[in-house]
Amino acid sequence: MPDKHAFLSPSSAERWYNCPPSAWLCEQFPDLGSVFAAEGTEAHSLCEYLLGVYLGRKDLTDPRPGLQYYNEEMEECCQGYVQYVTEIIEGFRKAGESPAVYVEQRVDLRRFIPESMGTSDCVIVGGDQIVIVDFKYGMHPVPATSLQLRIYALAACELFSALYDFESVRMVVYQPRIVNVDESSMSVNDLYAWAEQDLHPRAQSALTGKGDYCVGSWCRNCRARRQ
């Protein structure tokens, strides 16, 4: 289940990547949260439970009795997510692979983004490919090329490259409430080149408060904008 966001969190990457000084500016204002964020957190906890049950885990507690925003729509969305993930898993198996599956996997982003950690919804490794699936319960469209997902893909490669021999990264956004399922792929080498040449320098600028303010679509969730 997602936990407290890091200073340079993947979820806010679109903002601090494009407008580095906004990272420290937003620290001056409280994060008041929202009903939408609370709904998303609860939906993620249900996804984690349902997918864990499918994978045969016996140590899980059904979160539904304690979910404030649980309803039929949330159940259908989370069940759909599990079905989609299982289809990816079965696809690997039909190809003769034995995929490894990691649910709500804690990842370390600090090599490229100082002081940053995160949690990836689902990581699947099979053959020469690693797949990162990002569940979105919100209504704002999110593409598979989002910085958040690319950063989680990078972190997954960092974590699992010593265990598995994969060459390509497949990034998937599953956003059921607006019927958005989007995919993007790239080579591991290209992902690391982007991280070293682009992501890391921008993260350093954000951490030190350098760079220029820049207005764009990433201002939508900026805390400073709301003041």
Where are these regions (language model features)?
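Non-catalytic accessory segments flanking enzymatic or RNA/DNA-binding domains
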Residues: 100-101, 107, 195, 199-204, ...
